[in-house]
Each structure stands twice: as C-alpha cells, then as structure tokens.
Amino acid sequence: SNKFFFHSRPWVTIIAAPNKILMASKELNSTDYIEHHLTNLTYGKCPDGTWSFAEVHGKSQVAGTEASCNISEMGFWAFQVDTLFMSVLLGLGMIFFMRRVAKNASSSKPGRVQNAVEYLVTLVRDQVQDNFTADKNPLMGPLALTIFVWVFLMNLMDLIPIDLVPWIANGFAAPNAEGGAIHYFKVLPVADINAPMGMALGVLILIHYYSIKNKGLGGFLAELTFQPYGKWMAPINVIFEIPGFYAKQLALGLRLYGNLFAGEMIFILIALFFGGFFSSFTGVLAGVAGLALNFIWAVFHILVVVLQAFLFMVLTLVYLQQA
C-alpha cells in the first residue's frame, strides 16, 4: 500500500500508517524516514555538464525527470530549490501583508491587525534606538524589521506538520510513491545551513561596507592589524583579531541553524512514535506518548522560534553599531 499518513504537531489530527511508511516498492524504515526529511530538493550541475534534479536511491527527486548525479557530485553549483522557494515565498508574503496593513491604516479606527503591527514596529524601533547609537541611519529601522519578521516566518515553518507540505508537493501521495510529483521537500528554510549562513553573509557585507565608509579602508585595516598590541606586533594582532572578527558572523548563522535544525530533528524523532499507531495496543500507547511529547515540545519551541528571530535582529544591530 502507498497510503501515507501524517505525523502531526499536537493541534493537527494524528493519523499513522500501520507499522511502516511505504515508499513505492520499498519500505521506509525509521532511518530512511529521518534521511528523507533531512534531504533538500536540489537542482544542480552534474560532472558531465548537464543540469538536473538530484538522484536519491537511484531515483530523481522529481517525477518525470531524469537525474544525472546525486547531491554530493554537484559540488558548488547545487541549489536547494525548496529552501529558495520557501524563503522567497515568505519574503513576498511579508511584503504583501505589511504593504496592505500600511495601505489600510487608519488613525481614527485602527483594527486589531494594525495595532499588532504598530506594536511590532514600536518594539523593533526601541531595539534600534537601544542597540544602534551611532549616527542616524535610515536603513537600520527597515533592516531590523525585515530581519525579525522574515526570520520569524521562516522559523515558524517548524510548527507545520512534518509530512503535510511534502505530501502536498508529492501530489497527495506517499514519498517516492509510484508516480507522485516532488518526492523531497523541506518546508523549514533555516534547517538548511545555506539560508542562515546566506543571511549572515549579507550582514558581513554590510559590516565591511559601513566599516570602510565610516573609517576608511586604512582605518578598517588598522583595526584588524594594530590592536590590541600596537602596530609593531601586527602579525600577532592579525592572529587574534581576524578570526574573532569573522567568528561573530559565523556564529550568527550557525546559532540560528543549530537551534532550528535541532528543533526539527526532535519533531522528526517524536513523529516515529506514530509508526504503529493502529497496529497494536503498544503502538497506541506509543502514539499517546508521542502526542504528549509533541505538545510539550511545540509549546517550548514557540519560544525558540521567536527568540532566535529576535537574537538575529539584535546581534545584527550590535555588529553594525561596532562598524
């Protein structure tokens, strides 16, 4: 049978497949299930020069296409299509929503949505004023608001039922079922290290830009070479300063990735409790335990979703202030 059921978060109905989830003619055991949910939909350039979706277990990630190589063979020119799609979709959704709220704003009779957005803008404005005390920069407010809302929305995808979006993307069929559509799809962009590190790289570019703009190229290089022991100890200073300077931006991306990847991994592991939900009394008990664990972890994870977006925004402001 190719019948496929959801391993859901606590507020979604829990339905489970008997004993195992089936992938076409091959049973998908726990290891395969975890691997499946950690694999991105990838399109890239293969060693033979052709471009295609990746091959996984001898099959293309997208039905009806020919795969020329696996993900590891694509090298640098490999694009995580699901990460790009979800990031752009959420970004456009954020722009559309904010624009609509601003367009319909009323000073006489503000609605609930307008009040909520105004509270959010005030919160971000206060953080900008507290953490960015350099000369007024018109970019900082919009940048901080964009970072917070965009990262929050991407983090929020972690609370969507694990199998819901992949099931829809695959044409409402089991993963890798005969036919289907898109067999692999990760809905959480920040669980792919490319997304958080890409944002951290953007922050790093801004830091370089403002450092050179405000201090000049010579002043910026002097900061990295003449401190903390003076210009005569420049080689030693470089050893201390340059790794520390770039480690902050590296940590900015890794912190977001690590927290959300770990959270998603726990949701996947909890989902395994529902593998035998209808098969035996023990399976029912495991499913009930999974429900309880799902609820507890989801409630806790809401805090992680908000906190990580807030930290990314605040640290961006702090690093730009130092520039």
PLM region descriptions:
Residues 5, 19-323:
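Selective transmembrane helix interface/packing segments
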